[in-house]
Amino acid sequence: MPTLSVFTDVPMAQKLEGSLLKTYKQDDNPNKMFLAYKVCMTSKGRPWVSSVVRKTRMQIAQDPSLNYEYTPVMGMKSFVQASLNLLFGKNSQVIVENRAGGVQTVGDSGAFQLGAQFLKSWCQSSQIVYIVSSQKEPHGLIFQDMGFTVYEHTFWDSAHLCLDPNMLLDVVKHAPHGCVFVIGSMGNCQLTPSQWTQLMTLMKSKEIFPFFDIPYQGLSTGDLEEDARFLHYFVSQGFEFFCSQSLSKNFGIYDEGVGTLVVVTLDNQLLLRVLSQLMNFARALWLNPPTTGARIITSVLCNPAMQGEWRQSLEGVVENVMMTKEKVKEKLRLLGTPGSWDHITEQKGSHSYLGLNSQQVEYLISEKHIYIPKNGRINFTCINSYNIDYITSSINEAVCFTKDSER
């Protein structure tokens, strides 16, 4: 008699967005392209890595003085401090007053896992989470698995082809008292001074707890300080918050999964208490975070010359993205593609919306073998001199073929 498996009743999981990459890999068309990679790509179609990171990795590997003992539960102290200085500035108010701290995590997903665990245990009145970003984020799954009620909103206005701050403000207006707000892509959402004031006032009056997501610092504008400037607004207004800080993408060490859960409190005593609880959760989640990526980043950030070289490499990536967007827009103009394409260059960062509807996206995938997400948000570093003509002509074809549909 056959033995029944304990896994008999386990169903196949629902397909996620990652299945797009699987479909792409199964496609045997020689012209196929994938424009949704999360990492920055070079002009030759390889993942981008800063040259100073390559050199630093080699130096660390050849350093006989280094040991490979377990990392402390809270992570490398020098790495966490360097990460905080990068985010807020070494002489910022929150650093000087010892109101900011952090825990080294396994990438941004680890930061959200750790933060969600804390909120579930110690902020039981905040069991509703709003995730507001320029795109659909995977963090909702983490909060859902923790038992939170999750609502996801985007402030991309597909009708007017822009990121609309009023959509963000509207979500805050209708959010319940005491909820958690996971906010990403703030650098892309151009709020006026009056809108900033309105946002702060609304969040304070409703006692909303902000949980920021900063995965691409320096890769939005090319200016590290500018990309994190919005955090200073919240600090200056006396907000307490969490922040998921990923350093994998802007250093080009995607396989290392290097991140920090940043904590800002009203005073140092509160910070120490929060960090003590986070340490207990981290001990249960992963105990000891990985070392190599943290060592690379600390070495670069703590050496002025190396940090300067790294900053220049970020500026180079952003400049290339801006030029690529300009070329795409110009080629679409020369092709006579219907509609305005100014929204392409008005968006910041490597990941931006093309402004295509679902029918046009499906046409690109099925007819042209160009794989992009349903929302039409692509990685512009995937476009280079070898494929730009095919991509723009395919976009033109998709728009013209479906010209009776609204973008």
Curated annotation (Swiss-Prot):
It catalyses: L-aspartate + 2-oxoglutarate = oxaloacetate + L-glutamate. Its cofactor is pyridoxal 5'-phosphate. GO terms for biological process: aspartate biosynthetic process. InterPro entries: Aminotransferase_I/II_large, Asp_trans, PyrdxlP-dep_Trfase, PyrdxlP-dep_Trfase_major, PyrdxlP-dep_Trfase_small. Gene3D superfamilies: Aspartate Aminotransferase, domain 1, Type I PLP-dependent aspartate aminotransferase-like (Major domain). It is an enzyme of class 2 (transferase). GO terms for cellular component: cytosol. Transmembrane segments: none annotated. The modification N6-(pyridoxal phosphate)lysine is found at residue 249. It holds the Pfam family Aminotran_1_2. The keyword Cell inner membrane does not apply. It is found in: Cytoplasm. Belongs to the class-I pyridoxal-phosphate-dependent aminotransferase family. In eukaryotes there are cytoplasmic, mitochondrial and chloroplastic isozymes. Homodimer. This is Putative aspartate aminotransferase, cytoplasmic 2. The gene is GOT1L1.
